[in-house]
């Protein structure tokens, strides 16, 4: 029996004994691949007792649809499996293939503990520290602290430097970002950077649209739009923007800094590209040190 659907609407139930963030990420990553379909996510988190599970089953029966599950308690899993079979609904235990693979490779069984990934550990505090670092080193602030950065992002105004920095901070990476402005010298620390420097670029047309939107939000009057005055025609003038981008690219090329074009990239994709370039930088340093 197939799940109940109204037209292209599908109810998808996410049942977890922790926050449910993992299931939610998996479900959203998969659902965006089905354009035009209305997939409605029902999140059931922190399910750790039979009473809680019974409430979940009531919800599933009321709005029937397949189930993605990450429960670790075997008794609760068994009861949910039986209920889905009775209702004619499909269920997928999302983490099981990963557990099976790791158990086989490591030669050791899992020790199921709900929410273990959320225990406050060194990684958690590393992410918090990185977030504080980004806040204090955004848009060229606190230049003296750049030596402590894991990566320095450079680019023209509105090239996604700040959101990419915060995404990296959530991975525990101290990312500073420095604006590139024609006529203004870059900080001296970038002459001999202690960490990878990556230039972020965007095509001229979308950059102009982003900047125009920024000016609209600022009301054309108060505040600053990146490193430019919002009433400056150069900020959104096509020829000026193209010249600005060309200068920035040549600067990065002359200094040997790799670049990432963020046009049509999500922040996650941009961050992944930056991480790959960071790995390459460290690998070159390692090889140089080994051969010295």
UniProtKB/Swiss-Prot annotation:
Reaction equations catalysed: N(tele)-phospho-L-histidyl/L-threonyl-[pyruvate, phosphate dikinase] + ADP = N(tele)-phospho-L-histidyl/O-phospho-L-threonyl-[pyruvate, phosphate dikinase] + AMP + H(+); N(tele)-phospho-L-histidyl/O-phospho-L-threonyl-[pyruvate, phosphate dikinase] + phosphate + H(+) = N(tele)-phospho-L-histidyl/L-threonyl-[pyruvate, phosphate dikinase] + diphosphate
EC category: transferase
Signal peptide range: none
Binding residues annotated for ADP, in chain numbering: 155-162
EC number: 2.7.11.32, 2.7.4.27
Listed name of the protein: Putative pyruvate, phosphate dikinase regulatory protein
Role according to the record: Bifunctional serine/threonine kinase and phosphorylase involved in the regulation of the pyruvate, phosphate dikinase (PPDK) by catalyzing its phosphorylation/dephosphorylation.
Pfam families associated with the record: Kinase-PPPase
A GO term for molecular function: ADP binding
UniProt entry keywords in alphabetical sequence: Kinase, Nucleotide-binding, Serine/threonine-protein kinase, Transferase
Family affiliation: Belongs to the pyruvate, phosphate/water dikinase regulatory protein family. PDRP subfamily.
InterPro entries per record: Kinase-pyrophosphorylase (IPR005177), PPDK_reg (IPR026565)
């Amino acid at each position: 029996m197939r799940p109940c659907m109204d037209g292209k609407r599908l109810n998808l139930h996410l049942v977890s004994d922790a926050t449910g963030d993992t299931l939610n990420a998996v479900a959203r990553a998969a659902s965006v691949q089905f354009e035009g379909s209305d997939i409605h996510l029902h999140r059931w988190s922190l399910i750790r007792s039979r009473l809680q599970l019974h409430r979940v089953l009531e919800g599933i029966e009321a709005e029937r649809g397949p189930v993605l599950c990450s429960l670790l308690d075997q008794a609760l899993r068994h009861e949910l499996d039986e209920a889905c079979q009775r209702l004619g609904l499909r269920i997928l235990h999302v983490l099981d293939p990963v557990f099976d693979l790791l158990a086989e490779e490591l030669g050791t069984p899992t020790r199921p503990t709900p929410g273990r990934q959320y225990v406050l550990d060194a990684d958690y505090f590393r992410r918090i520290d990185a977030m504080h670092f980004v806040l204090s080193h955004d848009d060229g602030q606190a230049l003296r602290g750049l030596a402590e950065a894991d990566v320095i992002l450079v680019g023209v105004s509105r090239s996604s430097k700040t959101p990419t920095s915060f995404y990296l901070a959530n991975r525990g990476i101290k990312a500073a970002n420095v604006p590139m402005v024609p006529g203004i010298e870059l900080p001296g620390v970038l002459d001999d950077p202690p960490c990878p420097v990556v230039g972020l670029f965007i095509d001229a047309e979308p950059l102009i649209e982003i900047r125009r939107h920024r000016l609209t939000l600022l009301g054309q009057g108060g505040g600053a739009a990146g490193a430019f005055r919002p009433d400056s025609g150069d900020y959104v003038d096509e020829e000026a923007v193209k010249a600005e981008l060309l200068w920035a690219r040549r600067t990065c090329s002359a200094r040997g800094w790799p670049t990432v074009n963020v046009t049509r990239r999500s922040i996650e994709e941009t961050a992944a590209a930056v991480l790959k370039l960071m790995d390459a930088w460290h690998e070159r340093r390692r090889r140089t040190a080994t051969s010295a």
